[in-house]
Structures are given as structure tokens and as C-alpha cells.
Amino acid sequence: MKKFTLLLLCFVLPMTSAYAARIKDVAQVAGVRSNQLVGYGLVSGLPGTGESTPFTEQSFAAMLQNFGIQLPAGTKPKIKNVAAVMVTAELPPFSKPGQQIDVTVSSIGSAKSLRGGTLLQTFLKGLDGQVYAVAQGNLVVSGFSAEGADGSKIVGNNPTVGIISSGAMVEREVPTPFGRGDFITFNLLESDFTTAQRMADAVNNFLGPQMASAVDATSVRVRAPRDISQRVAFLSAIENLEFDPADGAAKIIVNSRTGTIVVGKHVRLKPAAVTHGGMTVAIKENLSVSQPNGFSGGETVVVPNSDISVTEEQGKMFKFEPGLTLDDLVRAVNQVGAAPSDLMAILQALKQAGAIEGQLIII
């Protein structure tokens, strides 16, 4: 029987602040975020592992034309050391022109490997279509690919994706609303009304009354100085304040592929009884030979004989009393020896019966 893994998360928040969270660990400043960049380019210098797809040939011809080299009309360059790629990067907040960022390069054609290639100058654009960085450099590819003359092939990891550390130069700064207005808004990473109110209370206890207010379950607005230098010092002090976030909602997370189950601290069970059993149907096909009597004129034939047996396991039942916790659920499930599929069926049935106080999430 396939085993399942059961993980128990029991987070106990004491009354003291020994395990309190910093504001910077549970929230982020609104408008201060990274931005995704993307670009299309060519990788050259491949040892015969490139491609000759139409769009690669077109891009190659356009690149030569930019350097003043005009190919004769109708010419289709047969290239195997060039590959068309997409280049992606993440532009951190407050990045300044001249700073460098990492880029990821991935093949979009039929190239077999990017190992040993060099990315040619590629413009990286943001959502607004503006160029924010320019990428170029030698790729580092962890994967490999080898192919024999008889068609045998060995591939390790992914040879068509590589990275260039500090491979892009920032050319344009992304404007942020950090220095504008009279307020700074913090957005919680996990929305919760109680956490938002506790965070606002912690800021008010530090700065004074009416300095912070919870706007909703996600946002907390804090009055801040207008001077940008004072605002940086102000934010540095605020983000290091500690407070006790609220406990998370009662949840049971089930991974249907791995059989992993995570049960939250506040999951409670209502009165219920569950029967767990199984029925096995086995069908066996036996072939026998039918031999006719001598001089009867009949033919020898093969006759299939089906043997069907049904085996039913002894049903198992466990009962939940009011107010039982996840410990009781774990103990009961382990006693019946349920497989992952059986356990998920039990949890779904309990949820549909209204016997679980909490969310059941299957991923």
C-alpha cells in the first residue's frame, strides 16, 4: 500500500514578542516592486547545435543588414551555430542606470543546446514597451546533450536554457510613487483583518495616535514626512517594528500527486462517523482446449473460461466527538491505514458533511 506523508503545522504564538514578526517580513511598501523585462535575441557561436528555422534565418539576415551586410534576394542562410532565444530578467526596485542584473536565456526554436553560445546585444523591454536594459554576454548552461551517429541521444538537465550573471545593463530607471504624497501604504503579503489592525496599532504605539490606520484586510496607511531623506529614515524605523500577526485561517492542504497533507492548527472536527473499507474484484481468464470425439467431424477449439472472485475487506469505522483537534484526526487516520486516495476521499466526505471546521484545499 502506498504510504502518505502527513505534516503537522502547529504554530503557537506566545503572549511575549519573542516570536513576533517584523513589518518588513509580512508586508511590502505599495508601489515599490520589481518589474519583469523581456526581449528577443540571437545566440551565436554554438557548436553545430543551433537551428535553421525561418524566423531564425530572418532575424539573422536582419542583424547582418543592421551592420551594412545585404544578402542577395532569395538567399536563405543555412546556419547551425545560431539560435533564436527569449531573454527575461527582473528589474529590482530603485535600480539605477549603469547597474547590472541577471538574465535568463531560453531557446524558442529547434536548437539542441545553447552550451558554449554568446548572447548578442538584446534590448529588454517592460510592459510599456520602453527599453529598460540591454543584455549581452556568454551563457552558462548546466544541461548537456549528446547524440550518436545511430540516432542515440543523451540529454542531461535542460541544455536549451542558460543564465548570464550580471548580463544586462540597466539603461532606464522605473519611476515609483515612494517620494510622493503624505502617506506610505503597506500591503500585507497575506490578507487578514486582524493582522492589519495589529500592525496599525503597533505603528501608532511607536509614532503616536492617528498616525496609522488599517484601510482593509491588506493595506495599512501610515502618515510619513514629505522630505525624501527623512522618509527613508522613517521607513527604516517602521519596517523593523515587531508585532504579533494573527493566526492563519483553519486549512487542510492536500497534494493529490504526492500524498502530502498539511493540517493547520485551528482545524476542528464536529461529531461524525466514518467507515473505511474496500472491495476487490479479481477476474482471471483460463484457456482450455475442447477436443471433439473421434470421427465426429468436429474441430478442436480453444475455449476461454472466466473465473471471477470478489473479496471485501472488513469495514473499519472511527468516530469523532465534538471539539476534536487535528491530533485526533491524525491518530484515527493512521489507525485505519488509509492510502492517499482513501484519505482524500475521507477528508472530502467529512467536509461535505460539514464535519470539518476549516478549508479543505486540494492542489
Swiss-Prot record:
Pfam families: FlgI
InterPro entries for this protein: Flag_FlgI (IPR001782)
Record's keyword annotation contains DNA-binding: no
Top-level division of the source organism's lineage: Bacteria
Disulphide bridges, residue numbers: none
GO annotations of cellular component type: bacterial-type flagellum basal body, distal rod, P ring; outer membrane-bounded periplasmic space
GO function term, MF aspect, one: structural molecule activity
Quaternary structure and partners: The basal body constitutes a major portion of the flagellar organelle and consists of four rings (L,P,S, and M) mounted on a central rod.
Function according to Swiss-Prot or TrEMBL: Assembles around the rod to form the L-ring and probably protects the motor/basal body from shearing forces during rotation.
Protein name as catalogued: Flagellar P-ring protein
Originating organism: Vibrio vulnificus (strain YJ016)
Upper taxonomic lineage: Bacteria, Pseudomonadati, Pseudomonadota, Gammaproteobacteria, Vibrionales
Gene: flgI
